[in-house]
Amino acid sequence: MQILSIDTSGQILSIAILKKDVIEISEYPSGKMNSEKILPEIKAMMSRLSINFSDLDGVAFGAGPGSFTGIRIASGIAYGIAYSLNIPIVGINTLEALATLIDNRHCISCIDARMSQVYIGAYQVNNLCITTINEPGLYDPEVLPDINFSEATIIGSGVITYKNQLAKKYKHINLNFIEKEFSLAGVIAKLALPKMNKNFNLDQAQPIYIRNKVAQTILERNSSK
């Protein structure tokens, strides 16, 4: 099976193609990319691998949470490709994708949500098998959710910004911090593979907008100026 994966939910834009057991990944600073530039990069990558769009068996994308604009771009491109080829599409939770990047079976995924807030989810991980312990949520860094792990790794862009608040809130946990932004398209492709279903419904793969009123709120602010 050959799967195209796109993630533009964070500061690193990544594109991946899973071809049998081999993953090819390309990364770019997301600030320099937009929807008009991504498609040519996808085409160039497929050309390097001698793959045509008609060879794809499915499309996956980082469904969020994360950058509202980035998620919208990735989902739009993924839907366009899936719809035109009539192939399955799968959206993968970016907090879950982060959790699979570490060896520790207890993970707290933490993504900087901007606007002085953070997205957090807690997971138990065994290879690519994920059990949700705390559902993903949007929090102020001073009012973080209770998480009852004895030890855990905290991973994601939110650690870079809010390490002190996280350390204070979870001082009862033996913590390992990973302060780094990750590209996720590769792991998203792997997570999407078992979810690809020939009896698919394009409407089932929806973006995860935890802060679902952000665009409207910004518009209202601008209108009031």
Predicted regions located by residue number:
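N-terminal beta-alpha supersecondary unit
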Residues: 1-63, 182
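Residues at secondary-structure transition points
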Residues: 29-40, 68-72, 76, 93, ...
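Surface "functional belts" at beta-alpha junctions
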Residues: 30-33, 88-181, 209, 214
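Phosphate-handling active-site elements
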Residues: 48-54, 83-94, 200
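Glycine-rich phosphate-binding loop signature in dinucleotide/nucleotide-binding domains
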Residues: 49-54, 147-150, 196
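DPxDG-like acidic metal-binding loop motif
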Residues: 58-88
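Acyltransferase
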Residues: 176-225
